[in-house]
């Protein structure tokens, strides 16, 4: 059973895909007017190989890293350019590749015909998430 909205559930293709998001504890929210399944366990203080914290990375528009030093992926649920996004650890995204991606249909997201400037959108997502984290820290949450 899914606790996610109809918008998210309509894009999820299988129980296995739903379980990927649920097992990661992803929480539905909105970032920059887009529905997102957020990983609330991102550690803002984790430091990358260049000495930057995750919060500093995100402020620059870079994806945060997980405990293995790998950057998070923003996965388009349903593989449409306007799909809800899921913040997934790199290892989770790779391990569940066949569950998360329908290889029988072309993706709208990263293809040459995509009208979306994905690099810019991804960067704006992480900047907005940095602002959320700073606001929570200021509240003492």
Predicted regions and their residues:
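Nuclease and nuclease-like effector domains acting on nucleic acids or nucleotide cofactors
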Residues: 1-72, 78-141
């Amino acid at each position: 059973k899914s606790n996610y909205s109809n918008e998210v559930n309509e894009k999820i293709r299988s129980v296995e895909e739903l379980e990927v998001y649920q097992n990661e504890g992803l929480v539905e929210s909105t970032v920059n007017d887009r529905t997102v399944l957020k990983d609330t366990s991102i550690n803002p203080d984790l430091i990358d190989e260049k000495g930057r914290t995750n919060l500093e990375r995100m402020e620059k528009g870079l994806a945060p890293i997980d405990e293995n030093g790998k950057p998070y992926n923003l996965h388009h649920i349903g593989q449409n350019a306007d799909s809800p996004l899921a913040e997934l650890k790199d290892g989770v995204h790779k391990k569940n590749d066949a569950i998360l991606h329908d290889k029988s249909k072309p993706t709208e997201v990263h293809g040459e015909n995509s009208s979306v400037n994905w690099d810019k959108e991804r960067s704006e997502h992480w900047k907005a998430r940095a602002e959320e984290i700073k606001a929570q820290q200021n509240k003492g949450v």
